[in-house]
From Swiss-Prot:
The gene is rlmE. InterPro entries: RNA_methyltr_RlmE, RNA_MeTrfase_FtsJ_dom, rRNA-MeTfrase_E, SAM-dependent_MTases_sf. It comes from the Bacteria. It is an enzyme of class 2 (transferase). It comes from Shewanella denitrificans (strain OS217 / ATCC BAA-1090 / DSM 15013). This is Ribosomal RNA large subunit methyltransferase E. Gene3D superfamilies: Vaccinia Virus protein VP39 (3.40.50.150).
Amino acid sequence: MSAKKRTASSARWMQEHFDDHYVKLAQKRGLRSRAAFKLEEIQQKDHLIRQGMTVVDLGAAPGGWSQVAVKLAGDNGKVIACDILPMDPIVGVDFLQGDFREENVLNALLDRVGEDKVDVVLSDMAPNMSGSDGVDQPRAMYLVELALEMCHQVLAPNGCFAVKVFQGEGFDEYIKSVKQAFKTVKTRKPDSSRARSREVYLVATGYKL
């Protein structure tokens, strides 16, 4: 993508962002990002998080999903969040800053989880987009593979998984992998997800491995 096209695309995104209904609603409700509404919509349909549950939130910054998760899990629940970017503290959220593709960060995250298994793994991770599908799609698929691997390491039997996936090369194969690990897998496109985005969310329940 040329610099000129990238600048035009960035300007269009900024205009859409500030005109966006969900951006304005997030600001009104004190939510850190419009992404919070995606998890709220998923929760309304699939009831993933309940009081007292332990939740891992991957790609958490700036904290929209963690805000929703900690409210749903309640005082007796636990939310462990991780992102390569910094995130302002949220009461009830144990946040680890680091790139969990790196072994030392992954080990630190597993230490936070401890010996007990978790009930829900959330992933809203996305790579820094270059504008080239040949570069961006493999990066995105690598992240969702890591999120599924996290499920294999920490998720309790019958646990749940919600992950953002970009449709493209590797998408169908990934769905097959998720279906092998969970009893039920649904594809969701929340209303708050921009229509032109290739992102969808796989919502998997009944972890069975």
